[in-house]
Amino acid sequence: MQKEQFSIAYVHAICSVAGFSCAKPSVDDQSIDLDIKASNRPFSQIGVQIKSTANIEYVKSDHINFPLPIKNYNDLRGDDVAIPRYLICLVLPDDNPEQWINQTPEQLLMLKCAYWVSLRDCMETDNTANVTVKIPLGNTFTPEALKSLIHKRSI
């Protein structure tokens, strides 16, 4: 529960800096945790599934091997959706919530960072429990990256 709430707060912070709004859908039946919108551009919305991990064994030299539940995988893949969908994975320093932030009178740091990937072009699988998704470490989830994802949507 704490990882989920922290991950959602992280995405909210990125959205705020980027100038976008985000909201939890009233029903989560399609693996979308948050809808992110740009209020000043029509048709500029994406949906995101947010996961987190403190397991350093998932993190490789240039990517994260994240075991995504099969339902989430199937909901996020494919191009037959009106709103693009992305997986965001927040890497945490460890499982202890006290290690996730560093606060001083001058700053509040959320430690480590999140990465994004589109599963749009991923293939069907015979897996029944989960699918290991490769998330590039070059896809850092930043305000600039989010603006780019939203811009792609509104073209």
Residue ranges and their predicted role:
Residues 1-30, 36-155:
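Mixed-charge (Asp/Glu-Lys/Arg
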